[in-house]
Design a protein with these regions (language model features):
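Signature of exported/secreted
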Residues: 17-260
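Bacterial N-terminal signal peptides
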Residues: 2-18
Length: 260
């Protein structure tokens, strides 16, 4: 039995966009991600399977005033993976120019990021880009705390995963990042995961939980200046191909930086 499409499990927080205020209209970002996935298929007559891979994505993000907030336009400049990446290199290459849209409300809270066209390449990399927008805002002060609850879907139809996440944020310290004053925000989150995915041995049901943490930097005007996160997921996959659910563990790490 094949491993799950690991792109759908890039669940850790990725890129935090600038909140409303004086942030630049257009910003370029680099996103580096690593993922290690292990599955025990012995109950289905298989073997223990492991995959580890990394990807690097470059994107251009544009913000425009819109009713009640700002519209978000994300254009993929490039996505590259190492030799173990489960998404084929031609698919990643064809994602160049793919466009995703989202929205920031007036408080700075982001809503869903979805492809403007359901082309194969855009849909397949949606999992890599699904966590672009954790909460950030201008005027953060040390000691500020807040929580956020989100539900995001990667993929479509019978090949999709829904992640429901509860996050707790705290503005922890004043620091310097990229020669700029910034507030370091720490984030802790828990998630529930449910979905389905076709496999060579029939449809599979996916469910489980994850837990993660990280920190990122926000300038006084709300601009995001980079960050890093890590997450561990404990999932189970079930279907007619196995007499009992098969356990899957996933460890993910994400780092984000701005490009000058």
């Amino acid at each position: 039995m094949a491993l799950l499409n690991a792109g759908y499990f890039t669940l850790a927080a990725g890129l935090v966009l600038p909140a409303l205020g004086l942030a630049p209209t257009t910003t370029k970002y680099r996103i580096d991600q690593t993922l290690t996935q292990e599955m025990d298929a012995t109950p289905a007559g298989g073997a223990k399977q492991r995959i580890a891979f990394s990807t690097t994505s470059f994107v251009t993000v544009s913000l425009a005033d819109s009713g009640g907030g700002k519209s978000i336009r994300v254009v993929v400049d490039s996505v590259k993976g190492d030799s173990a990446t489960p998404i084929p290199a031609p698919v990643l290459d064809s994602a160049r120019g793919a466009e995703f849209r989202g929205f920031l409300d007036k408080s700075g809270k982001p809503t869903g990021l979805t492809p403007t066209a359901h082309a194969g390449a855009a849909v397949q990399i949606q999992g890599l880009l699904s966590d672009f927008f954790p909460w950030a805002r201008a005027g953060l002060k040390v000691g500020d705390t807040w929580t956020d609850t989100t539900a995001k879907i990667s993929g479509t139809g019978s090949d999709s995963v829904t992640v429901r996440r509860v996050s707790a944020y705290k503005a922890a310290a004043n620091e310097t990042k990229e020669s700029r004053k910034a507030v370091r925000v720490v984030q802790d989150f828990t998630s529930s995961v449910q979905g389905t995915q076709p496999t060579p041995n029939g449809p599979a049901k996916i469910e489980g939980t994850s837990r993660g943490n990280g920190s990122y930097y926000v300038a006084p005007d709300g601009r995001y200046l980079g960050g890093a996160w890590q997450q561990q997921s404990a999932l189970k996959i079930s279907g007619s191909f196995a007499p009992q659910p098969l356990p899957i563990t996933i460890v993910q790490k994400t780092s984000v930086s701005t490009l000058k």
